[in-house]
Amino acid sequence: MSGAPSLADKTVMIVDDDQTMRMLIRRMLTRMKIGTLTEAEGGQHALQQLELAPAECNLVICDWNMPGMSGVELFGHIRALKPGLPFLMLTGRSDAGSVVAARNAGVPAYIVKPISPEELKTKVSYLLAKTA
């Protein structure tokens, strides 16, 4: 048996206004055998879900650019609601200024689209291992 922690008891929330992107990420996470996957169409919807059941989420994977509330804004709200919740930002922004802005906002992990399954698996496994 490997030393890797089981992901079967973990819950991951996917936040993206693009349904196709949510489905793609869901497919990748399903292959990783994550126990429960939830989805939110935007920041407000994600916050509502987290307020109803904050203990039931182990990781939020979120797009940066969404209408109404950006991923960086959502991250700030989540930090106030559940400070230790791991957060992974997904974005098409690859310029140095955007990376610095995300880091300055405290975003702990960042993937530039297009997302590779290997990179997603590495970051998700790392972030979830910190919650074990």
Residue ranges and their predicted role:
Residues Q19-T38:
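Two-component/phosphorelay signaling modules centered on CheY-like receiver
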Residues E39-Q48, G71:
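Helix N-cap/capping motif at the beta->alpha junctions
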Residues Q48, V72-P83:
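Short amphipathic alpha-helix used as the core "switch/output" element in two-component signaling
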Residues P54-I61:
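Active-site beta3 strand of CheY-like receiver
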Residues M66:
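Receiver (REC) domain active-site loop signature in two-component systems and cognate sites
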Residues E73, S94-A109:
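Alpha4 helix (beta4-alpha4-beta5 surface) of REC/receiver domains from two-component response regulators
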Residues G97, I115-V124:
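C-terminal output helix
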